[in-house]
Structures are given as structure tokens and as C-alpha cells.
Amino acid sequence: MLTSKGYIIQLETLMQQKQAMPGAKELIQAFQMENISYLILTERSSVTVDDILNQLEYCGIHGVKKENIYTSTMAAVEYIVTHDKKAIDVDYIGGKGIRQVLTDTGFHITHHQPQYFFVGMDRNLSYDEYQDVFTQLRKGSQLVSVDNRRIQIVDQVEKIGNGTIVRMLEYASGVKAMNFGCGTKVLLKYAS
């Protein structure tokens, strides 16, 4: 979260496919040299903040600290903790980034009637696993989307994004998702 005036940058504008985008190294270096606050936003749920820092280093974008990274999962958790003091039982699909934020916050991950069901990108799920999510939603779990992307580029190929999966789950279950992906007002509110 930004603690003073500064810049909010989406991770994908700095790095894609483990390569720095043109001008990314120079931009972050200029922020650091001028002591300008910045926050890098991402909806990536498959990786942890440490993984992101390592990827940035690999790309030649040096000196980024943990406090410079803010994920959509962090925003979702912060929102839920602020608005639902009784929230404790959650479940998720997605990667280790979601799991780490949930466990670091003290949520109990359970497959039995979670209050909130977080949905991040997981390209290895089966029909039966989506059926399990659907069942939990029909039993009363609140759907939480941490990645809005309708389409995402993987190895220069367009693939179905997490936002498309969330829309499928909304349609099937009749449960409207709480949405925390990049570009949402709530993500920007909690990031700034």
C-alpha cells in the first residue's frame, strides 16, 4: 500500500514472459534515485511476492522491495477483514500466491463450507474440481475473484483468462463475485 503520494504501476507494464519491458528498468531506477514512492500491482495468484521479486531481479529490475508489491489477493483479504470481522473459513483455487496471503492473514483454509471462495488462475483444474467450487457456492460461499483477465497471453498464445472462469461460476451458481482484479475501484482504493 502506498504510504505517500506516488505511482501505481501494473506489473505487466514492467515485465512480461520473464522479460523486462522497454523502459521498465530505467523507470524503477529513476523512482529509486529520486525517492519517489511506487507500488507494483498484480493479479497473479500463481506466485508469491518473493517469486515476483525474484522474477524482477532476473529481468534486471533491481531494488524492488516487498512493500513495493501489492496483489489483488491482498486487497481482497484486506477488504474482507475490514468488512466481515467474523470471516475465518475460506477456500481457494489458484496458486501458491493466494494460499500464502490467506494463511499469512490467519484465515483457516477448509473444503467444508467456507465463508469465502477465492478464485485465481489455475490451468490444471478438472471439471470435477470446478464442480466442487460450484457446490460450495450453492451452499452459501461468497465468490471472490482476484483476477479479472478474460484472456491472458501465455508463451505468446491467447488463453482463456481467470475472469472467464469466474463468469462461468457466476452464471452456473447464481452468485455474483466480489471482484478485486486490476482496474477495479476497490483494488485501487486499498492500494493507495
Functional labels for PLM-detected ranges:
Residues M74-K85, Y190-S192:
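Conserved phosphate-binding catalytic cores of ATP/NTP-utilizing and phosphoryl-transfer enzymes
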Residues G6-I8, K86-G94, F118-V119, S145:
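Short hydrophobic beta-strand segments
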